[in-house]
A protein has these predicted regions:
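TPR repeat positional signature
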Residues: 5-8, 12, 46, 83, ...
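Short coil turns that delineate tetratricopeptide repeat
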Residues: 40, 74-77, 111, 145
Length: 169
């Protein structure tokens, strides 16, 4: 029963997100809030409630749900998505140090998640750590691009991603 209602709420939220339908997103959020009240110790419900708030642009309201889900033992893909969501939310709220801490944890625990790395790069930019921000962006670009012109210069770009301030004299 509980998992069926949770699946229904997630499906509603995903439909609302895909269609950018605020009414459907609000319906999903309402259902998730009911589930969160009935099952306050369920990490997955708590996490999905955070996402529903984020999808509606209710970022400040999403943060406590993300934090609670993380302390409730969230794991696997949900943990990965929660770290990404919370880090991105903190960044959007201008809470750059919390964003950096959260996203660095995400990079440590999920090193192959390039989205987390790019959100970390944006956060580092906001913190005026331009060198590390550019290194992350350029490294991710060069490791994922199929653009033949970029591939032609891959060696040089990859080198300079780590040596941005170096000149030839």
């Amino acid at each position: 029963m509980i998992r069926d209602r949770l699946a229904e709420a997630i499906q509603l939220r995903e439909t609302g997100r895909a269609k950018q339908d605020q009414a459907v997103l609000e319906e999903a959020r309402t259902l998730l809030l009911e589930l969160a009240a009935a099952y306050p110790d369920d990490a997955e419900i708590t996490f999905q409630t955070a996402v529903a708030h984020d999808n509606l642009g209710l970022s400040r309201e999403a943060v406590p749900f993300y934090l609670r889900a993380l302390t409730q033992g969230l794991a696997g893909p949900d943990l990965e998505r929660a770290l990404m969501g919370l880090g991105s939310t903190y960044r959007g709220l201008g809470e750059y140090r919390q964003a950096e801490e959260t996203l660095r944890r995400g990079v440590r625990e999920f090193p192959h998640n390039r989205a987390i790395q790019v959100f970390l790069a944006m956060t580092l930019y906001n913190l005026q750590d331009y060198e590390e921000a550019m290194e992350l962006v350029l490294t991710n670009l060069m490791e994922t691009t199929s653009d033949e012109k970029l591939q032609y210069f891959k060696r040089g770009i990859s080198y300079y991603a780590l040596h941005l301030d170096e000149t030839w004299g």
